[in-house]
């Protein structure tokens, strides 16, 4: 693991596998997710571009005791399009909604950033439809400002998700370029 500046790390995929491990943003995000899961019934959706959050689904009884319905989607590239390679459900009774949804797009993003963001965000928009009065925490460990041109698809689709669902979606960004306050200001979200 190589530290490149405060609160930012580069590491191999699937090496930070505990809620009590990690450096900077990764460690902070895992603690925040566990805190929400322990104290509320709010839903959490995580875009995981680093492959570091699967443990919340696979080992959640240790991290967050109790029967909390969780689901993990891991994606791969097929015919130049991202598709779900694996879906892992934990404590998901028939008709029950997951409290934590992790979209592991780490391998997809190594091939195509734009198509990955568009495909995964489309599934997020579908999930949020009809749930306007359900508070959802949206953890994005990806940077919507990775491309300076705001007309880029990665920016447009993320902006649409946040603005369409207003205050019912609480975004938690882990941007390398901009802080949470600055991103929220650009998206017209009151911190």
Predicted regions and their residues:
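Switch/coupling segment of Walker-type NTPase motor domains
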Residues: 2-16, 31-123
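Conserved P-loop NTPase motor cores
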Residues: 17-23, 28-32, 111-191
């Amino acid at each position: 693991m190589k530290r490149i500046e405060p609160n930012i790390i580069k590491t191999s995929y699937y090496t930070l596998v505990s809620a009590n491990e990690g450096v900077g943003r990764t460690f902070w995000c895992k603690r925040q997710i566990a805190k929400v899961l322990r104290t509320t019934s709010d839903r959490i959706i995580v875009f995981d571009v680093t492959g570091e959050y699967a443990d919340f689904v696979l080992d959640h009884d240790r991290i967050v005791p109790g029967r909390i319905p969780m689901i993990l989607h891991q994606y791969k590239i097929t015919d130049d399009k991202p598709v779900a390679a694996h879906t892992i459900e934990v404590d998901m009774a028939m008709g029950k909604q997951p409290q934590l949804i992790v979209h592991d797009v780490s391998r997809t993003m190594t091939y195509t950033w734009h198509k990955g963001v568009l495909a995964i965000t489309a599934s997020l928009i579908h999930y949020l439809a009809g749930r306007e009065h359900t508070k959802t925490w949206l953890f994005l460990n990806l940077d919507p400002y990775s491309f300076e041109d705001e007309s880029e698809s990665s920016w447009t689709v993320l902006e649409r998700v946040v603005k369409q669902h207003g205050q019912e979606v609480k975004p938690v960004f882990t941007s390398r370029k901009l802080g949470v306050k600055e991103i929220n200001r650009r998206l017209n979200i009151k911190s």
